[in-house]
Amino acid sequence: MIDHSQKRYAVIGGDGMLGHAMVRFFRKNKKEVIGTSRRSNSDERAVFLDFAKEDSWGNILNCTDAIIVGGITDYWECKNNPDAVFINEQCIPKLALFLSKHNIRVSFISSNTVFSGSKPWPKENAPHSPVLDYGQQKSNAEQNILQMTYEAGTKDLIKIIRPTKILTMDTSPLPDWIKAWSKAQKVDTFKDLIVAPITLGYVVKCLSTIVESKESGCYHLSGSENIDYFNLGKLLAKALGYSSSLVNKTTSIEAGVAIPFLPKYSGLGMIGTTKMFGIESQKIQEVVKELCK
C-alpha cells in the first residue's frame, strides 16, 4: 500500500512542453517529483516509461500521484497514424487503471477538443461532441479510464483535467509574427481561428493545485474569453510596442491554409472548478502580460 503521507509525483510525459514545466514547478517548490520519458537521450533524471510497454509501468510505483501528460497529441498524426488510437485510447487507460489499482491517484490531462466548439462555455459535466480525431481519442480515453476504474472500484482516485490552448512565445505562429514585426513587416492573421488561450505558468500553477488535492472529478482550465488570432495579434503587437497596422486580417480559407479544427467557441466553463478550488479563468490581459515578460 502506498504511503500518502509523503507525496511523490510522477509526471508521465515529462519531456514534453507541459510535462517539463510541471516537473520544474514541483522541483522549484521542493516537491519530490520524477518525470518519465520513453527516449534514451532525455534528462538523465528521467525514469523510463513507454505507454506501449507494460513492463515499464512498474518503474513509477513508488509515487503517490501520477499526472498523465503524454500521448500522441499532434492533430494530423492522430488522424493518420493507426498507433494513435492504440496509445491514446487503449494504453493510457490501461496505465491509469494499473496505477489506481496500486492506490496511486491519477490525473489525466485531456483537452477542450472533446467538445465540438459549437456551443459556448461547456460545463465540466457537459456531454462530449468531438469532431476531431484527436478530440475523439481524448474523449474515448476519458470514458475508458472512468469505466475501467469504476469497475475496479478505484474511480475515486481519478481526475480528468481539460485545458484550452496553452500559449508560449514559442507557440506557432507567434515567433514568425514577432520576427516580422521587428522588421516592420505585416503578418496575416486568421479571423476564423478562435482560441481561449492560457499561459504555461497559469496552467502549471492550477494543475498543481488540482493534482495535490484528494478531490476526484473532472475540471476545466480556460481563458476567460474566446478571441480570434486577428485580435490576439493586435493585442500582442501593442504589448510589444509594435503598431497594430502590422496585423492584417484574413481567414485560413482565404490564405489557403488547412486547419483541422476551427471551433466557433474554444473556451470552457469553469463553474465546478472554481467552486471546488477557487481557480478563475485567465483573463486575456493576463495572458498577454505573461507572454511579454
Residue ranges and their predicted role:
Residues 83-94, 128, 132, 136-139:
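Glycine-rich NAD(P)-binding loop of the Rossmann-fold in SDR/ketoreductase-type enzymes
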Residues 246, 261-293:
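C-terminal amphipathic/interface module of NAD(P)-dependent oxidoreductases
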Residues 189-194, 219-226, 276:
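Glycine-rich Rossmann NAD(P)(H)-binding loop
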